[in-house]
C-alpha cells in the first residue's frame, strides 16, 4: 500500500491513549496498527508513564493523562491534537462510540478533521436516540450486520461491516477445568448491562438444582463509585438466595480468569456503551468457554456457537444455565463451535484484509 512514493500516513483518532486504559476503541485501533505494517500510523500515547506497554510502531503523540482513562481532559486533548494532526495525514481513522458528545463532534467534522478521507469505526452506540442528531464522519464501519442496518437506516450512507479480531495464538483453546463449576459474568456497571440479570438467572439455576460458584468481574466507568456499586450487587445476590458467589473489581489477567471458569454468562438487556461484539465474549469463545448470551440483534452473528435467551428473561437464562452445567457433551460441542467461529470469522488475517482493502480504496 503506497501513497505516491511513500507509505500512507493515517491518524488513529481515539478518545484516550492507546497505551492507557483498556477499552474497545483502544483495542480496535491497536489491532489495526498491529495488522497493517505497510501504513505509517500516528497515535495518541499516555504521558507521563504508560498504563500498559505502548505499541512499537508508528508515531506517538503525547497526551497528558494521569491514568489513561478518557476523562474530559483526555477527550479535549484528543480533539485538539486530532484537529492538528488531521491536516498532516492522508487519512483519519476514528474509533469513536456514538455517545452524548458525538452529535456535536460530528457537526464540527470539517473544522476538527478537515476535508480529507475519514474512516469511522463505531464500537457501539450508547443510545439509539443519538443517531437522529449526527452526521456521518465519512465511510462508516460497523462491527455487526445488525448495527450496520441501524446506521444505514439513520442515513449514515456508506456503511461497511468489519468484525473485530482476536488472535487465536494469543487466546489458545483450553481444556474444561476440573472441579466445582465456576460461572463468570464480566461487564460494566451499566444500567441493564447484565449483572443483575446474571444474578437472578443464577438464583433460578440454583433453585433448579444446579451447583456452581458465580464470579462477577465488574469494571467501572469514569465518575462511578465502584465500591458502592459492587456492594449493591452483593446485596442483590444475597437477597436472591445466592451463597456461593463473589464480586470482583476489574480483572487485569483475563487469561488466568478464563482458565478457571467453565462458562460465560453475559445477558445484557441493552449493550449501552459496550461494543456490539464484546471482546470478553470473543476471548471466552476462543478459550473454549461456552457462552450464554441475551438474544440481542447484535449477537445473531454468533449463530449456533452460543446459547441465547430473551433479553431480561432471568428465568429462561437460568434454565439454560442449569441445563448446560448438566450436559457435558453439549458443553464440548459449544466449546468447539465457539473456537471454530472465532478462527473462521474473527481472525487477524480477515480483519487485516478488510481494513487494508478499505484503506486502498479511499487512498486511491
What role is predicted for each listed range?
Residues 130-131, 149, 153, 163-180:
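Acidic anion/phosphate-binding donor-loop and adjacent secondary structure
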Residues 293, 305-315, 323-329:
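Conserved acidic donor-binding segment of nucleotide-sugar-dependent glycosyltransferases
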Residues 286-293:
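Short hydrophobic beta-strand element within catalytic cores of glycosyltransferases
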Residues 259-274, 289:
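Acidic donor-binding loop of glycosyltransferase active sites
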Residues 22-31, 190-204, 353:
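A conserved mid-protein helix/loop that constitutes part of the nucleotide-sugar donor-binding site
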Residues 267-282, 300-301:
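Nucleotide-sugar-dependent
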Residues 230-251:
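Nucleotide-activated donor-binding/catalytic signature segment of Leloir-type glycosyltransferases, i.e.
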Residues 11-13, 174-193, 199-202, 215:
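Conserved donor-binding/catalytic core segment of Leloir-type glycosyltransferases
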Amino acid at each position: 500500500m503506497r501513497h505516491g512514493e511513500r507509505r500512507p500516513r493515517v491518524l488513529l483518532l481515539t478518545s484516550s491513549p492507546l497505551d492507557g486504559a483498556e477499552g474497545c476503541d483502544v483495542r480496535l485501533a491497536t489491532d489495526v496498527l498491529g495488522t497493517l505494517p505497510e501504513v505509517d500510523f500516528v497515535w495518541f500515547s499516555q504521558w507521563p508513564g504508560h498504563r500498559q506497554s505502548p505499541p512499537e510502531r508508528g508515531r506517538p503523540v503525547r497526551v497528558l493523562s494521569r491514568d489513561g482513562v478518557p476523562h474530559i481532559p483526555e477527550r479535549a486533548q484528543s480533539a485538539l491534537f486530532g484537529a492538528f494532526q488531521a491536516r498532516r495525514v492522508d487519512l483519519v481513522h476514528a474509533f469513536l462510540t456514538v455517545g452524548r458528545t458525538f452529535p456535536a463532534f460530528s457537526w464540527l467534522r470539517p473544522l476538527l478533521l478537515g476535508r480529507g478521507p475519514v474512516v469511522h469505526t463505531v464500537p457501539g452506540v450508547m443510545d439509539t436516540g443519538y443517531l437522529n442528531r449526527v452526521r456521518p464522519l465519512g465511510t462508516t464501519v460497523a462491527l455487526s450486520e445488525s448495527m450496520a442496518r441501524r446506521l444505514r437506516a439513520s442515513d449514515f450512507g456508506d456503511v461497511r461491516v468489519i468484525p473485530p479480531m482476536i488472535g487465536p495464538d494469543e487466546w489458545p483453546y483450553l481444556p474444561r477445568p476440573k472441579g466445582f463449576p465456576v460461572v463468570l459474568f464480566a461487564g460494566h456497571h451499566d444500567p441493564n448491562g447484565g449483572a443483575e440479570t446474571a444474578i437472578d438467572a443464577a438464583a433460578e439455576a440454583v433453585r433448579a438444582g444446579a451447583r456452581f460458584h458465580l464470579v462477577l468481574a465488574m469494571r467501572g466507568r469514569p465518575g462511578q463509585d465502584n465500591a458502592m456499586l459492587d456492594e449493591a450487587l452483593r446485596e442483590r445476590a444475597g437477597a436472591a438466595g445466592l451463597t456461593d458467589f463473589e464480586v470482583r473489581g476489574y480483572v487485569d489477567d483475563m487469561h488466568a480468569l478464563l482458565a478457571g471458569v467453565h462458562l460465560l454468562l453475559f445477558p445484557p438487556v441493552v449493550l449501552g456503551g459496550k461494543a456490539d461484539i464484546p471482546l470478553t465474549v470473543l476471548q471466552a469463545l476462543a478459550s473454549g468457554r461456552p457462552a450464554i448470551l441475551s438474544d440481542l440483534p447484535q449477537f445473531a452473528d454468533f449463530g449456533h456457537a452460543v446459547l441465547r435467551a430473551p433479553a431480561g428473561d432471568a428465568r429462561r437464562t437460568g434454565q439454560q444455565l442449569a441445563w448446560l452445567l448438566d450436559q457435558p457433551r453439549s458443553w464440548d460441542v459449544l466449546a468447539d463451535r465457539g473456537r471454530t467461529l472465532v478462527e473462521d470469522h474473527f481472525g487477524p488475517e480477515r480483519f487485516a484484509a478488510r481494513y487494508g482493502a478499505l484503506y486502498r480504496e479511499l487512498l486511491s
